[in-house]
Amino acid sequence: MRIALDAMGGDHAPGEIVKGAIEAAEELHLQILLVGRPDAIEPLLKEASAGARSRLDIVAASEVIAMDESPATALRKKKDASIVVATRLVKEGRAQALVSAGSTGAQMAASLLGLGRISGIDRPAIATILPTLEGGKLLLDVGANSEAKPRNLLQFAHMGSIYAEKVMGIANPRVALLNIGEEETKGNELVLGAYGMLREAPLHFIGNVEGRDIFFGRADVIVCDGFVGNVVLKFGEGMVSALKTMIKDELKNSRMAQLGALLAAPALRGMGKRLDYAEYGGAPLLGVNGVSIICHGSSKAKAIKNALRVARQGVQQNFIAAIQEHIPGKVEPVC
């Protein structure tokens, strides 16, 4: 198995990206194609052991799509951009998955154009794993579609359910619709329409959940449009960051608190690990005809290593084939 890694994408590229690739090659024994400028990548590989270096190959790409560039315009003008070349490697079968911490819009567009949509899927969705009291749970869409139709949410639910079962190992995953109340009569036109479709679909649909339910792990797959999902995701990131700052501030102001923190250090480290997005790697772009993993733009080595692990799991569990097999037959009769 080979995974194409966009070495030039992200706030900390190429240094942290290549470092994450080296760690993945050493610890996970992955074969990785580093896509980008050889003159920028090659010097960084001196840190790799001989075994890891043998699993890392460079594929030249002379251009980079910046975060603030228009994805459509950039893809037309920059045919040799690292994300374009990495996607092409998957399309041609030279790699089995794609990972990037670069422009999300560019990766979505490149994946759609290069890999195509799975038959029966109208729009792809970005799915992310959220830490909850019951372990990691899947939220989608978190940014691919700021607007959606009930039919799209139904398709997201099917894809999310398959991914949760195949890749996350959750048997008969509970699917819920994110809403402003638990009652089926609440919500806007989108949510009300989706509720009726989900209720009739061959899914383990448990109804609506509210925002306060998400982190208690009440559902395994939570479905919403990309606007709402992105707000939830960014709110969660901000809340975790604020809580960490609050704890540090309180510790500075109290010697007793500092003593307590020493005693509670193992528990605090465990909590920090559970809340660290880097532990979960990247978010799969579900609905495209290939494994495409989107990483946070500020990803460092640990996040990249874990994103490569997620990509490997996706390929090994063959969730793309599962979606291809189940989606058309399940979705069409309902709509």
Curated annotation (Swiss-Prot):
<keyword id="KW-0443">Lipid metabolism</keyword>
<comment type="subunit">
    <text>Homodimer. Probably interacts with PlsY.</text>
</comment>
<dbReference type="InterPro" id="IPR012281">
    <property type="entry name" value="Phospholipid_synth_PlsX-like"/>
</dbReference>
<keyword id="KW-0963">Cytoplasm</keyword>
<dbReference type="GO" id="GO:0005737">
    <property type="term" value="C:cytoplasm"/>
</dbReference>
<dbReference type="Pfam" id="PF02504">
    <property type="entry name" value="FA_synthesis"/>
</dbReference>
<keyword id="KW-0444">Lipid biosynthesis</keyword>
<protein>
    <recommendedName>
        <fullName>Phosphate acyltransferase</fullName>
        <ecNumber>2.3.1.274</ecNumber>
    </recommendedName>
</protein>
<dbReference type="GO" id="GO:0008654">
    <property type="term" value="P:phospholipid biosynthetic process"/>
</dbReference>
<comment type="function">
    <text>Catalyzes the reversible formation of acyl-phosphate (acyl-PO(4)) from acyl-[acyl-carrier-protein] (acyl-ACP). This enzyme utilizes acyl-ACP as fatty acyl donor, but not acyl-CoA.</text>
</comment>
<keyword id="KW-0594">Phospholipid biosynthesis</keyword>
<dbReference type="GO" id="GO:0043811">
    <property type="term" value="F:phosphate:acyl-[acyl carrier protein] acyltransferase activity"/>
</dbReference>
<comment type="similarity">
    <text>Belongs to the PlsX family.</text>
</comment>
<keyword id="KW-0808">Transferase</keyword>
<dbReference type="InterPro" id="IPR003664">
    <property type="entry name" value="FA_synthesis"/>
</dbReference>
<keyword id="KW-1208">Phospholipid metabolism</keyword>
<dbReference type="GO" id="GO:0006633">
    <property type="term" value="P:fatty acid biosynthetic process"/>
</dbReference>
<comment type="pathway">
    <text>Lipid metabolism; phospholipid metabolism.</text>
</comment>
